[in-house]
Amino acid sequence: ADNPGDDGN
């Protein structure tokens, strides 16, 4: 699962 702080920008 992706971390909640990971915005992908």
Swiss-Prot record:
The keyword Oxidoreductase applies. It comes from the Eukaryota. One of its GO terms (molecular function) is peroxidase activity. Its EC number is 1.11.1.7. Keywords: Oxidoreductase, Peroxidase. The keyword Oxidoreductase applies. Optimum temperature is 70 degrees Celsius. This is Peroxidase. Optimum pH is 4.0. It comes from Pleurotus pulmonarius (Indian oyster mushroom). It is an enzyme of class 1 (oxidoreductase). It catalyses: 2 a phenolic donor + H2O2 = 2 a phenolic radical donor + 2 H2O.
